[in-house]
Amino acid sequence: PTPDRLPHPAAIRVTGITPQLAAEQGLPEAAFITRIHQELAQPKTCGIGYNSIRFDDEITRFALWRSLRDPYGREWQNGNSRWDLLDVTRAFRALRPAGIEWPVRDDGFTSFRLEDLTAANGIEHGAAHDAMADVVATIEIAKLLKCCDEHLFDTLYRQRTKRAVSALVNLDDLTPLVHVSGMFGGARHYLALVVPVAWHPTNNSELICVDLGKSPDFLEQPAEIVREHLFTSQIDLPDGVERLPIKTIRLNRAPVLL
């Protein structure tokens, strides 16, 4: 670590890594990310994690960029890809729940915290948030999912790439798709039937969809009202007005679509 900046005390408490220990056994950031990149960039491999696309991958990208390395290439070059088991696990809960013990939170909804899932299913996890323990736990959860429904597991794995998931999209016929996302909430098992309506005007990796579980009345509203409500948070909308049931899906982030 650099001597001019100390880690947050809460981070030290969670990891058990003090500045003294990091200085004694750690690596400079540039050397550290070089070793990480060498592993992740192995040709024809898939980087898999649990909530990794929204969290771990973003940290890895930033570290690569800060060390003057390509932050994106290892994700898609040389036959490489990435996959995230969080939404895969949500898909299993909604579509194929049998064979897995699903922990329940205080609010009555399923907990998808990795440490809760491993505890409920008798999987050794060691110290939660310890990197190696989390890796082993993620592998064991993947094994459990595949054992419970190999067909669904393999289908979602095959559809992890932008090219594969793009093949499901039919804008001419407005073919509905099943989509799993944290945006839909636990009350809906994080699942919704959506219909793709258009590609994003400036990002060809982003698909614009309408949530068929919500009222389509907004389609009758003037474009100015739609635009105003689309970019207004729920708390700022008038009473009785819900956010528009429009969602974008980033096809290069291994979304769950069926």
What residues fall within each predicted segment?
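Acidic catalytic cores of enzymes that act on phosphate-bearing nucleotides/polynucleotides
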Residues: 158-237, 241, 246
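Metal-dependent phosphoesterase signature
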Residues: 15-32
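A broadly tuned preference for mixed-charge, low-complexity surface segments
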Residues: 21-26, 97-116, 178-203, 258
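Metal-dependent phosphoesterase core characteristic of DEDDh/y 3'-5' exonuclease domains
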Residues: 1-19, 38-151, 156-159
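Generic detection of long, well-ordered alpha-helical segments
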Residues: 26, 30, 54, 132-135, ...
